[in-house]
Regions:
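Alpha-helical substrate-recognition element adjacent to the catalytic core
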Residues: 2-123
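C-terminal cap/substrate-recognition subdomain and adjoining C-terminal extension
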Residues: 79-93, 100-231
Length: 231
């Protein structure tokens, strides 16, 4: 039986972590009249996530059904379902926290038979033929992103829970400063190393399950010690 108030919550980034690609970029590349123009501006730090999404959405004319059909073919890490099962078996909450699009994330997860995960992301709204976005997790403390991931971390910690964070990119940087245990790869692993933030590398979610099990046995352990990213 699932614990209604788990002692440990796992927060996992989506784009580049659960999927090898970025869902928003996939949608923009295939369905937006402007393509990746605003995404490239975001990558250069010229605009924030809210402007990137809002301006790009204004050029999308495809239907919800067309986009959903394309998203259904997106691959996920084949070991992610193992993390879902591990969390549920151990009474932990597992949630997705992403600076991406909630509807797109939910569509991909459902296509792989994964249901019921909380998703903290920018909220896609379909209004007839019009596609818009709301930003319920925006906070001025992280102005360049639509989802303030530290805000989500603090939400769980305020309930007395320990938070495990898994990520790979720029929008994850502030969150790792507040998590109890961090798993990082790619750009996020480099950031953690440069900033002296303890973090364990990972190649797949089975490795993460094993390391979390060790940590639960003794949370005082520093799993990142002597474990460079990818080992």
């Amino acid at each position: 039986m699932t614990n209604p108030s788990p002692r440990v919550t796992i927060l996992c980034d989506f784009d580049g972590t659960i999927t090898p690609s970025d869902l928003a970029d996939f949608i923009f590349r295939n369905f937006a009249g402007c393509g990746l123009f605003y995404s490239q501006q975001w990558a250069q730090g010229l605009i924030d996530t809210r402007e990137e999404i809002t301006r790009t959405f204004a050029t999308i004319t495809a239907s919800r059904e067309e986009i959903a059909a394309a998203l259904a073919g997106i691959a996920i890490d084949p070991t992610f379902p193992d993390l879902v099962a591990f969390a549920r078996q151990n009474g932990m909450e597992l949630a997705v926290v992403s600076d991406g699009l909630d509807w797109a994330i939910d569509t991909v997860l459902k296509a792989h038979g994964i249901l019921g995960l909380p998703i903290y992301a920018n909220h896609v709204v379909f209004e007839g033929e019009k596609l818009t976005c709301e930003f319920p997790w925006y906070d001025s403390s992280t102005p360049l992103v639509g989802v303030c991931k530290p805000l989500v971390v603090r939400r769980y910690r305020a309930e007395g829970q320990r938070v495990i964070f898994i990520g790979d990119g720029r929008s994850d940087r502030e969150a790792v400063l507040e998590a109890d245990l961090v798993f990082a790869r790619d750009a996020l692993a480099k950031f953690c190393q440069e900033q002296g933030i303890p973090a364990s590398g990972f190649r797949n979610f089975n490795e993460i399950c094993s390391q979390i099990a060790r940590w639960l046995d003794d949370p005082r352990k520093n799993l990142a010690a002597g474990e460079p990213p990818g080992l």
